[in-house]
Amino acid sequence: MSDINVEVVYALPDRQYLRTVKLAQGSTVEQAIVASGLLTLRNDIDLQKNKLGVYSRPVKLTDILEEGDRVEIYRPLLADPKEMRRKRAERAKNNAQ
């Protein structure tokens, strides 16, 4: 089996982390994240809570990676998008009166 190269990314408002890791073919999303070292560098990453993706496509920890994939670790939302839209619509309605 040959090795594959994948990127693991985690972005904060003021800093971005990008790690390129070499893994055995057939490696999982979880193995890539562990190999990147981001779990020890950032204690705010919780693989049971943070959502994950590969090029914006949702994935699970057990999904197999391919050469050139970019594993993205997403931060939790600070506000519920539906609730924010509802509040904006309510404000717009009140301002229009």
UniProtKB/Swiss-Prot annotation:
Domain of life: Bacteria
Name of the protein this chain belongs to: UPF0125 protein plu3376
Family named by the database record: Belongs to the UPF0125 (RnfH) family.
Originating organism: Photorhabdus laumondii subsp. laumondii (strain DSM 15139 / CIP 105565 / TT01) (Photorhabdus luminescens subsp. laumondii)
Xref: Pfam families: Ub-RnfH (PF03658)
SUPFAM superfamilies according to UniProt: MoaD/ThiS (SSF54285)
